[in-house]
Structures are given as C-alpha cells and as structure tokens.
C-alpha cells in the first residue's frame, strides 16, 4: 500500500534509513497487529480499577498487540519494571507516555516538581517552563518513557475551569505560545522525547470536566482562529509531533465545516472527522500529505 503521508516532512522528519525501518516493520505485521498498534493501554499497579481485566501483562501484550502504554503513578522501581517487561513482549517498540507538565513528578512518585503552567506564566520568565520541560525529559526517559502528554496549550478564559485552570500557561494566545514553546524547547534539549500538546480543539472556556461529560468550546470560528487556532498553528509549524484530541466539541466551527451537521449530531474532537481530518490535518496541516 502506498504511503499517504510524506515521512520526510514535518512532523516525522525521517531519513531514508528510518523510513526503510518503518516500511520493513509494517511489512511483517499482520492486520491484527496493525489494529493493535492503534491502541494505548492504561496499566495499574495493584490491579485494574476500571476494566476488571485480570490478564497478565504478557497475556495482554500477546492478545492485543498494543502500540502504546500509559500507567498510573508508581515508584521508580514499579514504573521501570513495568516498562521493561512490556517492551520485552512487544514486536514493535512501544510508545510509553507520561503526563509531565510540571516536572518529573508526572512520571513517577518522588519525581522533581518544577512549576505548573500557571506558575510559569506568573513568573514572566521563559526559563522556568524551559526547566520544567528539561527536568521532565531527564526523569521520564530514565524510566523508559518516550512520549510526553504535555504541555497543555489551552487558554484559560474561564477561571472556574476544573481541568486546566492551573495547568494552562495563560489567558491569551501570546502567553500560551511563549511559555509552552519554552517548555517544549527544554523537553527536547537533551532527550529524544515525542512532544504531544493538548487538548484539541481547546479546553479552558467552560466549567465541565471533559473526562466525565461532553466538553463544549462555544467560540465562533473567528474567535477560535484568533486564539486557540493561533496556538495550534504555531506549534504545528514548529514541528510538534503529536496532538491529543479532547472530548471537546467545537460546534460553531464544526457546522461551518459541515453545514449539514445537526446540533444533536455534533461529536467531540475524539470522534469528529470534520475536526480531525478537515480542521487539524487539512487546514492546520498537522500531517504532510505525500505529493
């Protein structure tokens, strides 16, 4: 099957040897293997509190062929032991993610706390978020983590927001761009960590918890383009490798992209093709299509 994206361009930036590895690896994967690569499993220390799964790690890896792993916070020994075990069972090197938005404490118990997004912005010193990114990368990669599910590039327009009120880096696009860029510069200064910004299309405008109910960003297309859109466009042009979609709808923009979309059919970005395929990939050009 021909590639639909150009792996030499952003956000991949692969050389010929790396592209050959990708193609050779895909060639020996079965369809079941490839389906498994789409999923990231959340692991727990002391039992799975959500799914009731009682499979061993080896059984889970052999059955589902997952592409990535995320874990609930554990001790350094627990985290490193889990990652090493999972990697030993995987055909393809696993993507292992942690939420380090303020330092290494997001990767492991006892990790170094540097600064929250709000503290970084309040300092008015880009060196603070730079150090948060630097320490995050040092401590998470020491454990075997290779993907960082931060920073939050959201904009706080509602101080009652329960998710990003202290994790976001400001109340306007300029501050968010400045301080999240500094964080990402620190994150990648010494280590090869995959950058992942969130929560597309943007949290911080409302009070609901998008983890529990549908989040809604009610900005008009024009308002979004001048705020959240500016932030995402900046980071995409800078080469960010991954963007996490939130369980957040952007109804006025979605209906502009798809005029036939009824109110009752509006879905969050995690399920909305007009937001992921049209706005993020086509308009903002997250993925470089092969010419």
Annotated model-derived regions:
Residues 113, 153-163:
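Short, conserved phosphate-binding/catalytic loop or strand-edge motifs used
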Residues 67-70, 122-124, 168-172:
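The substrate-binding groove and active-site-proximal loops of carbohydrate-active enzymes
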Residues 47-63, 128-139, 223-232:
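Short, acidic/polar
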């Amino acid at each position: 099957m021909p590639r639909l994206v150009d792996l030499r361009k952003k956000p991949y930036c692969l050389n010929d040897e790396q592209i050959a590895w990708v193609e050779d690896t895909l060639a020996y994967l079965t369809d079941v293997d490839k389906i498994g690569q789409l999923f990231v499993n959340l692991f727990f220390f002391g039992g799975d509190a959500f799914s009731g799964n009682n499979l061993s790690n080896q059984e889970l890896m052999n059955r589902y062929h997952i592409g990535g792993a995320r874990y609930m916070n554990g001790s350094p020994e627990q985290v490193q032991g889990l990652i090493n075990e999972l990697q030993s069972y995987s055909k393809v090197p696993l993507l292992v993610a942690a939420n380090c938005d303020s330092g290494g404490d997001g990767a492991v118990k006892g990790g170094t706390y540097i600064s929250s997004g709000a503290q970084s912005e309040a300092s008015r010193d880009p060196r603070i978020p730079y150090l948060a990114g630097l320490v995050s990368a040092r401590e998470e990669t020491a454990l075997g983590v290779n993907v960082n599910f931060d920073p939050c590039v959201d904009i706080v327009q509602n101080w009652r927001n329960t998710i990003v009120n202290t994790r976001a880096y400001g109340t306007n696009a300029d501050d968010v761009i400045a301080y999240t860029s500094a964080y990402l510069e620190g994150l990648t200064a010494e280590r090869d960590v995959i950058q992942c910004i969130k929560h597309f299309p943007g949290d911080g405008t409302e009070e609901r918890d998008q983890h529990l109910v549908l989040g809604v960003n009610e900005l008009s297309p024009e308002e979004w383009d001048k705020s959240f859109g500016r932030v995402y466009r900046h980071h995409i042009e800078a080469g960010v490798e991954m963007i996490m979609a939130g369980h957040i709808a952007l109804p006025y923009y979605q209906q502009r992209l798809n005029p036939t979309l009824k109110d009752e059919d509006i879905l969050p970005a995690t399920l909305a093709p007009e937001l992921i395929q049209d706005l993020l990939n086509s308009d903002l050009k997250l993925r470089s299509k092969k010419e």
